[in-house]
Amino acid sequence: MKSLIASLAVLAVLVPSIAVAADDRCPIESLSIDDITKGISQAPTCDAALKMFQKCSVGTSGDIGIGAVVTQKCEALFEGKLSTQQKRAYSQARHVCDTKYAKEDGTMYRSFEAFCRAQAAHKVAMPFFQPAASKGK
């Protein structure tokens, strides 16, 4: 009886973890960089694109093109809408991303740069996200 209770306790801990892990998987079956890039370009929003990038990144220089798609999708939300001060701040954030790992060798650092740029664009785009309630109107 004790072993049954112990087994159930272990299952109670593992089952939610398995469900969370499944949710964190890349939704793109193939995992080829071209397919990931295409899938992210078809994401409905900047936010969805960034989340997909986080789940599907490869951790190498292959993330440069994938991150560029996310960055472009997010930049489209605020293009022509930023004040001079906001443009300057975004430019500074991009500069930080471009220089932070510039002296580091290795493709993972190019991935870090791509993530940094995508996250900077996402942060600037956030005030321009459409509220969920108004999407159907």
Task: State where each predicted segment sits.
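Sec-dependent signal peptide recognition
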Residues: 2-9
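Generic marker of residues within folded, mature protein domains
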Residues: 11-13, 64
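N-terminal signal peptide c-region/cleavage motif recognized by signal peptidases
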Residues: 14-18
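Mitochondrial intermembrane space
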Residues: 22-137
